Amino acid sequence: MSDEKTEQPTDKKLEDAHRDGETAKSADLTAAAVLLSGCLLLALTASVFGERWRALLDLALDVDSSRHPLMTLKQTISHFALQLVLMTLPVGFVFALVAWIATWAQTGVVLSFKPVELKMSAINPASGLKRIFSVRSMIDLVKMIIKGVAVAAAVWKLILILMPSIVGAAYQSVMDIAEIGMTLLVRLLAAGGGLFLILGAADFGIQRWLFIRDHRMSKDEVKREHKNSEGDPHIKGERKKLARELADEAKPKQSVAGAQAVVVNPTHYAVAIRYAPEEYGLPRIIAKGVDDEALALREEAAALGIPIVGNPPLARSLYRVDLYGPVPEPLFETVAEVLAWVGEMGASGTPGAEPQH
């Protein structure tokens, strides 16, 4: 049936969807970018963050409550909170920037409020049931299960690897605990980023496939869009005809005036040859045309009394020469015969034997 959506979406269909805020993207890829950027940031600034983290731990554990305990505790908490904010704010800014870049890399720049508009279908129970049992929902469920199993397995494996460090931290100093904590955090971010990168790459492929699938078109929609884009075929043909007429009018009008002869095909081609040694050392093509243009050149030549020579092979060969260009060397002999015949005819006033074709 023509209503079945079996055709791939056109470029215009995809552009319209993008303009409406509908794009293929994977949240897992964005999460991977954030986690890996966090890992890289901590690895590059480990010494700075380590010092600040140790200072915070010292501040939290070294509270002198011998005098004014309540005031001392308030000051300590306020100072601790301020230092924590100052330490995490740049990290949060970097994470937000990386998340935006990762999303932009997948979707491009999208400025649309349509995705947040209220749609009646969203509160329609029938539409809700249809969405629940849709292919996209089933795929999302499978992805959720796979992601949960993968994350659980990765966390368990990481715990087994890091368990000695975690247990040993109980016997370490505060400074050593801070260093161990930074190392564990970097490893966690690296492992999480790698896992979500793999999941995100697969998810992006799935999202792209679903996006194309959801925007498939019927044959009628493709025809209608093509008609709207290109216009009605009859009108399009009229436009082309008008464009040809305007192009013909814009062409400089050719004339055979000054030519020694016009070589014809006999009706399809007409080429005017001029030979004036004082102007140019070789014979030149000063006018040429096919069909209607050829007929006009023949009529003008007849009116001006310029000899018309029927030589189909020569006419076709000369027509391929650029306008106002010289006669090519392979045609010298044949053109010379034509010009000699024209000269004899002009000298005697009566036509002689036409040159052999």
Curated annotation (Swiss-Prot):
It is a multi-pass membrane protein. The keyword Membrane applies. The chain crosses the membrane at residues 29-49, 84-104, 149-169, 180-200, 323-343. It comes from the Bacteria. It is found in: Cell membrane. Keywords: Cell membrane, Hypersensitive response elicitation, Membrane, Plasmid, Protein transport, Transmembrane, Transmembrane helix, Transport. Its main location: membrane. It holds the Pfam family Bac_export_2. GO terms for cellular component: plasma membrane. The keyword Transmembrane helix applies. Belongs to the type III secretion exporter family. Involved in the secretion of PopA, a proteinaceous elicitor of the hypersensitivity response in plants. This is Hypersensitivity response secretion protein HrcU. It comes from Ralstonia nicotianae (strain ATCC BAA-1114 / GMI1000). The gene is hrcU.
